Amino acid sequence: MVTQNKKILIITGSFGNGHMQVTQSIVNQLNDMNLDHLSVIEHDLFMEAHPILTSICKKWYINSFKYFRNMYKGFYYSRPDKLDKCFYKYYGLNKLINLLIKEKPDLILLTFPTPVMSVLTEQFNINIPVATVMTDYRLHKNWITPYSTRYYVATKETKKDFIDVGIDPSTVKVTGIPIDNKFETPINQKQWLIDNNLDPDKQTILMSAGAFGVSKGFDTMITDILAKSANAQVVMICGKSKELKRSLTAKFKSNENVLILGYTKHMNEWMASSQLMITKPGGITITEGFARCIPMIFLNPAPGQELENALYFEEKGFGKIADTPEEAIKIVASLTNGNEQLTNMISTMEQDKIKYATQTICRDLLDLIGHSSQPQEIYGKVPLYARFFVK
């Protein structure tokens, strides 16, 4: 229990929505605990430090999944044995130093790979606990911060990845990845489908088109899925693509087995009410699906964290990788046409899922902050070369 005024500084990043969602889940949980003596502040470090350059990098990152896959692959897998080598290791250093001087946090929580934090822990000799919430299922070296107090990871296999590169096992906790509590709340699946004019006795295939960043080929996929899966109905989430929603709505408006939606705040209900989902393997999306025990098909995952997540889920029996739309259609047909494999996948997910990750992490954070010392004067520990950057 926090009995003295304490402050948690959360460093996150807006490269994709997942890191921000994790941050929000943790903030919401801490707020729900009504801790009068605790304040929580969030900062998108790279965006605040270098807004123009970071905006350019974000656009490249998003487009890399479509146009620059080999380039991103080279970036992601470069020098995996050199844990301290990262070309943007000092990116955001000035901003981070100023944040620590201004805010004087009692604990720093990273929900985004932040290599610059290792500069502080290795060279500044700060005495502030640093914790990290890893939002993927396989380790990448940029998640490692030397002398961290805690790492919160998704699975025991992820913990082994950390141990294998020399991280103290006692600092790594297998908690699962934090998501919104609503994904662990019971849903009346039958009523939800009825309310949306769908048949609760049919197998519902959920497709998240917005996840792929493309707007072509989905009409053929839907048509072929329905042709090869006799007892199926399809829910297509088009995201923010109004053009895709218009074209698909026009094509399937008279088909009672197809529901076309735009952006929705009800992914929780749709995941809970579907038997299979076609999506990209972003860490948070698949964790939400994992919580709802919905087997997933990963269509042409991009090299990097997406592919690593997909390979892990396939290895564990939670999902399958399809390199092409045609392969995805075949997998759907195989799983929905009286095959026990789908039931077995759901059962495996039920057995292996970790519940209430957000609550577990927040309780441990409070324990860490309860044992932390008063924040020291950061400036006194800053090396001479870095003091020129401090405002």
From Swiss-Prot:
It comes from the Bacteria. The keyword Membrane applies. One of its GO terms (molecular function) is 1,2-diacylglycerol 3-glucosyltransferase activity. It catalyses: a 1,2-diacyl-3-O-(beta-D-glucopyranosyl)-sn-glycerol + UDP-alpha-D-glucose = a 1,2-diacyl-3-O-(beta-D-Glc-(1->6)-beta-D-Glc)-sn-glycerol + UDP + H(+); a 1,2-diacyl-sn-glycerol + UDP-alpha-D-glucose = a 1,2-diacyl-3-O-(beta-D-glucopyranosyl)-sn-glycerol + UDP + H(+). GO terms for cellular component: plasma membrane. CDD domains: GT28_Beta-DGS-like (cd17507). Its EC number is 2.4.1.315. NCBIfam families: PRK13608.1. This is Processive diacylglycerol beta-glucosyltransferase. It comes from Staphylococcus aureus (strain bovine RF122 / ET3-1).
